[in-house]
């Protein structure tokens, strides 16, 4: 396939996918869930599996899981599944990233521990682990600020579909600039603690729904001159503490409120579905970025955001 034909194929594929997500609800799934206790919406097993698929495929692709978990169920006529359900199935994504990177994590931890014992502060594994720690601080800091000073953040206008659409469009443009200007010279062995801190600052932007954690960190990595696969791989490692902490906090709050009768099995199936598809998304993206650019995601995010705004303007979706 020529470069020209491949570019058009990527563009058409991205446009078709984005439009289908926003504008073509599947009526076969259209039964709306009823409100359940503990902040979790009652849903059947099929709905939970589908939302687990959405969570898994979008958590690690640079297209925003928060945006899709809000848009897809609304477009399918199910209503908002609730913040609690979203947080619970995120545990599946946590399990997947730990599963995929278990070898890397154990090597880094053992290497860093050994370096500390030997006082070898120039050790690569120690520097990498410190970079991950430094990169986690910004999102924890700003997350605590939001939780403290904006207690109703989950229902604030910044989480509306319109705001999510704008964030998706802006991030698509930034990723496009990063793709164009990034030198892509540095590989995984040349990461620094500064990379961790800078990528961590970008990760903090994901507190704004629609930005995408993997999207913002991948974009920052390209601007810093990292190879695409290196930026994505470090993004996943950097996201482990942040995703884990967020999931555990929401899980604690949910358990304190209690889970409605009949909600446990769909939740479990949603977590399993999210774990399976998260693993596939991680493996697929890393393999894809070895030889391909991020333009398919750039076009997808752009059309996705524009389609949401168009659907809101046409009255197909409510800006809530």
UniProtKB/Swiss-Prot annotation:
One of its GO terms (cellular component) is plasma membrane. Its main location: membrane. The chain crosses the membrane at residues 9-29, 82-102, 130-150, 161-181, 191-211, 236-256, 265-285, 296-316. It comes from Nostoc sp. (strain PCC 7120 / SAG 25.82 / UTEX 2576). Pfam families: BacA (PF02673). It is a multi-pass membrane protein. InterPro entries: UppP (IPR003824). GO terms for molecular function: undecaprenyl-diphosphatase activity. Catalyzes the dephosphorylation of undecaprenyl diphosphate (UPP). Confers resistance to bacitracin. Keywords: Antibiotic resistance, Cell inner membrane, Cell membrane, Cell shape, Cell wall biogenesis/degradation, Hydrolase, Membrane, Peptidoglycan synthesis, Transmembrane, Transmembrane helix. The keyword Cell wall biogenesis/degradation applies. It catalyses: di-trans,octa-cis-undecaprenyl diphosphate + H2O = di-trans,octa-cis-undecaprenyl phosphate + phosphate + H(+). Coiled coil: none annotated. It is an enzyme of class 3 (hydrolase). This is Undecaprenyl-diphosphatase. One of its GO terms (biological process) is response to antibiotic. The gene is uppP. PANTHER family: UNDECAPRENYL-DIPHOSPHATASE. It is found in: Cell inner membrane.
């Amino acid at each position: 396939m020529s470069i020209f034909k491949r570019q058009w194929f990527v563009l058409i594929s991205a446009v078709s996918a984005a439009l289908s997500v926003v504008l073509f609800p599947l009526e076969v799934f259209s039964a709306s869930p009823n409100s359940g206790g503990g902040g979790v919406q009652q849903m059947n097993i099929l709905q939970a599996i589908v939302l687990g698929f959405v969570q898994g495929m979008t958590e690690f692709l640079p297209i925003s899981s928060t945006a899709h978990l809000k848009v897809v169920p609304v477009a399918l006529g199910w209503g908002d599944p609730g913040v609690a359900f979203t947080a619970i199935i995120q545990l599946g994504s946590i399990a997947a990233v730990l599963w995929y990177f278990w070898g890397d994590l154990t090597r880094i931890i053992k290497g860093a521990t050994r370096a500390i014992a030997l006082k070898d502060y120039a050790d690569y594994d120690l520097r990498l682990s410190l970079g991950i720690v430094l990169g986690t601080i910004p999102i924890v800091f700003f997350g605590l600020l939001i939780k403290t000073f904006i207690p109703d953040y989950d229902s604030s206008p910044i989480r509306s579909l319109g705001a999510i659409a704008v964030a998706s469009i802006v991030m698509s443009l930034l990723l496009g600039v990063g793709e164009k200007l990034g030198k892509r010279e540095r590989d995984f062995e040349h990461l620094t603690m500064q990379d961790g801190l800078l990528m961590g600052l970008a990760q903090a932007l994901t507190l704004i729904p629609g930005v995408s954690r993997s999207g913002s960190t991948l974009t920052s990595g390209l601007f810093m001159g990292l190879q695409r696969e290196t930026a994505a791989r470090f993004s996943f490692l950097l996201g482990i503490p942040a995703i884990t902490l967020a999931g555990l906090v929401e899980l604690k709050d949910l358990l304190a409120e209690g889970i409605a009768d009949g909600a446990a099995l769909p939740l479990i199936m949603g977590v399993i579905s999210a774990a399976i598809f998260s693993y596939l998304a991680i493996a697929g993206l890393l393999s894809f970025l070895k030889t391909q650019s991020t333009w398919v995601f750039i076009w997808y995010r752009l059309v996705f955001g524009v389609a949401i705004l168009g659907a809101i303007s046409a009255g197909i979706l409510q800006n809530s």
